[in-house]
Amino acid sequence: MNLTETPEIVHWPEVHYVFVEKTGPFMQTAPAAWGEAHRLSQKLLQQHRIDRYMSLYRVGPQIYRAGFGIEGPTAHVPEGLRYEVFPGGKYSRFVLTGPYSLLPQASGRVFELVQQLGIELRDDFNIENYVKDPRVTPAEELVTEILVPTA
């Protein structure tokens, strides 16, 4: 697995975020949330430009959000999607290069590294930022940033 094991401290920017939220085990909720989000994205694109694809998740209560960063604030999103401003903040960033099927293993390793390195976390969403477009990028060349909220 091609995962950076030394994190980079970054300040994640504020994001106008449109998403589908699911609760429960991520192995079931993540694919379901992304399926709905992708289905609804065509309606979203009729009114907004998508800047980024990203998921936000909390491990404790098992909240998973699949969604899109858009260019600015909005009062209207397609039915089935929610909108909020994600404030961003300080994060420790790890980078996975390879297929999305490695994300569960990579995320587990990231949380092991957080403990081993003594990274102090704050209570906020973790982020998966999907850097390359999977429609045009071979799976082994996909890049995903895994970011943990850092105190």
Placement of each model-derived feature along the sequence:
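A solvent-exposed interaction/effector surface
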Residues: 1-151
